[in-house]
Amino acid sequence: MKTLIRKFSRTAITVVLVILAFIAIFNAWVYYTESPWTRDARFSADVVAIAPDVSGLITQVNVHDNQLVKKGQILFTIDQPRYQKALEEAQADVAYYQVLAQEKRQEAGRRNRLGVQAMSREEIDQANNVLQTVLHQLAKAQATRDLAKLDLERTVIRAPADGWVTNLNVYTGEFITRGSTAVALVKQNSFYVLAYMEETKLEGGRPGYRAEITPLGSNKVLKGTVDSVAAGVTNASSTRDDKGMATIDSNLEWVRLAQRVPVRIRLDNQQENIWPAGTTATVVVTGKQDRDESQDSFFRKMAHRLREFG
């Protein structure tokens, strides 16, 4: 009898343990697959592609790669003497036409005062027309001077905002053309995270919800808030042919791959050592409040850590 009870007890304990293990694994799996999280997330930032508005030789480079610069700080300078001479030439043209306009104004005024009693109407009109022509030439010379002044000012390339110089690929003595990108500036305090979440998990990733960001290869957890969700993504299953007809890819009815939608997350503390833009991270949306780790069960903590491994 005791042997039978002992065998029954062992069997019951085994069954209970198996059931508990199954429940734990099921809960962990549900939490792992259905909660709003993704490992496909990247740090991003506002990046300014800095290109000169004038062409010429680079005479001086004032910064080095990955340097933190302030707004208005000089990055590099382009051949100023050439543009200084162009400005002086334009100023000389303005001075010439100013003197000429003064002479023609006096001449036209004198002829208008004398009137048709002293000369023909044709001579009076001719003087007025010459004055108008000179005034137009003066206005054109002034515009050329202003443009030359603007070009001279833009030979000095300055940082448009506080940030980090990155991918600096210009050196003293090189010739750079107008509009060619010389350096990228990653704006300070503009970092955010783009989390590409599956459409089945968007319900738990609404704007205003709190999020945890864990950079790849780090145990540090950053805090943030869901800022916005993309309004649309490209439909990869539908294209158009040459005649404008829709082309729909064949699909298996029982296999449906969830689309990924970009979710923008605003970081709480921009003063921390933010990871470089483009690096990857794991994002977990915790809901309206931050997650209280002290109240997490063992299985939830385990599922939370499993996210780092796939």
Curated annotation (Swiss-Prot):
InterPro entries: CusB-like_dom_1, CusB_D23, MFP_Efflux_Pump, PHBA_efflux_pump_AaeA, RND_pump_MFP. It is found in: Cell inner membrane. Keywords: Cell inner membrane, Cell membrane, Membrane, Transmembrane, Transmembrane helix, Transport. It is a single-pass membrane protein. SUPFAM superfamilies: HlyD-like secretion proteins. The keyword Lipoprotein does not apply. It comes from the Bacteria. GO terms for molecular function: transmembrane transporter activity. The chain crosses the membrane at residues 12-32. GO terms for cellular component: plasma membrane. The keyword Transmembrane helix applies. Forms an efflux pump with AaeB. Belongs to the membrane fusion protein (MFP) (TC 8.A.1) family. This is p-hydroxybenzoic acid efflux pump subunit AaeA. It comes from Shigella sonnei (strain Ss046).
